[in-house]
Regions:
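Accessory terminal regions of nucleic-acid processing enzymes
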Residues: 1-131
Length: 131
């Protein structure tokens, strides 16, 4: 908030309409943004500092896009903070915009995963009844 002058609203788990899935961003910003904060080790933080604006670390793309899907937000500020770094390098903010093509693929993958979970649950119930 101090760096960007954006007020952040805390939020809990947000369920995606019609699915047993959702996300829990670290905060919501205004009507259009959300927030994801990481506090990594120095080496990892340095890698994040090298990312171009608009890019998130590959390992967090699905999480960030999923948060925008769940919240309906247009962008997410990916924030990395490491207090051990020199002043001026402690905070890294990369604004990532919503990618509906990625979210559509994520939707397909989540629905497929939930179908697998449902099938496992049915199989386990049948096994329990047969025992």
């Amino acid at each position: 908030e101090a760096k960007t002058r954006n007020l952040v609203d805390e939020v809990g788990f947000i369920q995606i309409d019609g699915l047993m899935a959702g996300a829990s961003p670290d905060g919501l910003i205004g009507d259009d943004g959300c927030l994801e904060i990481k506090c990594p080790e120095e080496q990892t933080h340095m890698g994040y500092l090298r990312l171009p604006q608009g890019k998130a670390p590959a390992e967090y793309v699905a999480q960030i896009q999923g948060q925008m899907w769940a919240t309906g937000r247009a962008w997410c500020d990916f924030v990395s903070y490491n207090p051990s770094m020199p002043q001026g390098l402690q905070l890294c903010i990369r604004r990532v915009v919503r990618d509906d093509e990625f979210i559509n693929k994520l939707h397909v993958a989540v629905v497929a995963f939930l179908a697998e979970v449902d099938a496992e649950e049915i199989e386990l119930k049948n096994m329990l009844e047969a025992a």
